């Protein structure tokens, strides 16, 4: 569980939806310091490893950037092996005295797999291809699960609708969305 420290920057929602070899990762742009919005257009969904991996973060912003750098390093050591790179990152996260204090979570995806990396160093693969993290994560997750079986709606449309619902409910999530996708 991420505990809020009013001196750190927090607040976001990240959602990932996978259908076959297509995946979408979407996040809002709000950064909050305590209970104040300090930025509305932050980019918390990014491409890594030569654009073959998409990563989104929730939690303390500075901590998340540290994790992005570490993950990029692990991906360089284990190219094309997202699971292995994430497990190696999680091991470091659990064992390193400095990293253990980081307050962030990540969703990472490539053409084959989607994973959630938690603040306790767990690496989890969602059973149904849908994962969400952050302050509005449960709202986005619920909406995406409700829409996933609707005929004729793309995963990108589902992601946008789910994030709109999350942003309408969660005060730490806004409507400025960044979306990245990998399509077959």
Swiss-Prot record:
GO terms for molecular function: metal ion binding; threonine-type endopeptidase activity. InterPro entries: ATP-dep_Prtase_HsIV_su, Ntn_hydrolases_N, Proteasome_sua/b, Proteasome_suB-type. Its EC number is 3.4.25.2. It catalyses: ATP-dependent cleavage of peptide bonds with broad specificity. GO terms for biological process: proteolysis involved in protein catabolic process. PROSITE patterns: PROTEASOME_BETA_2 (PS51476). Keywords: Allosteric enzyme, Cytoplasm, Hydrolase, Metal-binding, Protease, Sodium, Stress response, Threonine protease. Na(+) binds at residues 167, 170, 173. Belongs to the peptidase T1B family. HslV subfamily. Protease subunit of a proteasome-like degradation complex believed to be a general protein degrading machinery. A double ring-shaped homohexamer of HslV is capped on each side by a ring-shaped HslU homohexamer. The assembly of the HslU/HslV complex is dependent on binding of ATP. NCBIfam families: ATP_dep_HslV (TIGR03692), PRK05456.1 (NF003964). This is ATP-dependent protease subunit HslV. It comes from Wolbachia pipientis subsp. Culex pipiens (strain wPip). The gene is hslV.
């Amino acid at each position: 569980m991420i505990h809020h420290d009013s001196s750190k920057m927090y607040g976001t929602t990240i959602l990932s939806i996978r259908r076959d070899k297509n995946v979408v990762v979407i996040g809002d742009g709000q950064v909050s310091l305590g209970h104040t919005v300090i930025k509305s257009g932050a980019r918390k969904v990014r491409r890594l490893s030569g654009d073959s991996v998409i990563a989104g973060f929730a939690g303390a912003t500075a901590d998340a950037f540290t994790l992005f750098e570490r993950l990029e390093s692990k991906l360089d050591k284990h190219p094309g092996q997202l699971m292995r790179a994430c497990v190696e990152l999680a091991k470091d996260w659990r064992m390193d005295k400095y990293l253990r204090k980081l307050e962030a979570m990540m969703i990472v995806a490539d053409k084959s797999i989607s994973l959630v990396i938690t603040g306790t160093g767990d690496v989890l693969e969602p059973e149904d291809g849908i994962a969400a993290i952050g302050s509005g994560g449960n709202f986005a997750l619920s909406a995406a699960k409700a829409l996933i079986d609707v005929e004729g709606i793309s995963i990108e449309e589902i992601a946008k609708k789910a994030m709109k619902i999350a942003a309408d409910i969660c005060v730490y999530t806004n409507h400025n969305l960044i979306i990245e996708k990998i399509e077959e």
